[in-house]
């Protein structure tokens, strides 16, 4: 009987080791979503040229492993990569599928992660049509994804990053459904993390579409063991009244992933400069 029990334990361990999303060692990651605000000369003192060093210092200080970023123009992407040796970026710009317009890039530590596959699709009725504006959207929107492997543990997972439309309610709902379909199709049983500026708060249809879908995606902040910092992300460089500020940037995870803590820093950094018109959100995940 003891021999049979021992063999069952060994067999179970073997099966788990070869199933998607399982490996011998857990993977612990520091993951962020961060709308860095596009390089707009009208921002004057808050223009990118005055914030880029503050942003990159923040990323280094937080030791972020992977970041989904939004509103990143090509020159901003170059600035980030120049100032962040050891990081690489995945993604293309939304207007031409190359360098024109905003990226929704995935920034990651090159020495830790192997990119197995990656691509960008357009949030529209025609996801492979470059530059297409979907449904009732005001402008072109994209999602960038990557299937990655942690070189330290062998864990395979999917990262998805997006920026939803700021006008179209149908576009936001349909974008949510499209991304869920893509995660199911590409990730399968592997863990997946969705980051983005969703341009909606908790009580929106798009948020409910993501969190109540039969394919489960959980709001990382809500399931975190510990939550610190402020409760909002968008503040418009401090111009939104304190009682009107909302959380419109989110990180969602599949059920295999544990969230040890979630942190949204105060909008003004230690040197007195704003990081952006949005606060980033940082989570520590265990895959």
Positions of predicted regions on the chain:
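Solvent-exposed loop/turn segments at secondary-structure junctions
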Residues: 36-39, 72-76, 94-98, 112-113, ...
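Metal-dependent phosphoester/phosphodiester hydrolase catalytic core
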Residues: 138-140, 149-173, 186
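Structured beta-strand-rich core segments of catalytic domains in phosphoester-bond hydrolases
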Residues: 66-157, 261-265
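Active-site beta-strand/loop signature of hydrolases that rely on acidic residues for catalysis
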Residues: 30-36, 55-80, 107, 146, ...
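N-terminal, active-site-proximal structural segment of metallo-dependent hydrolase catalytic domains
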Residues: 2, 6, 19-83, 96-101, ...
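Metal-dependent phosphoester-hydrolase catalytic domains
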Residues: 112, 170, 174, 181-192, ...
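Second-shell loop/turn segments in exported
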Residues: 40-46, 64-66, 132-133, 161-169
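Sec-dependent N-terminal signal peptides
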Residues: 4-14
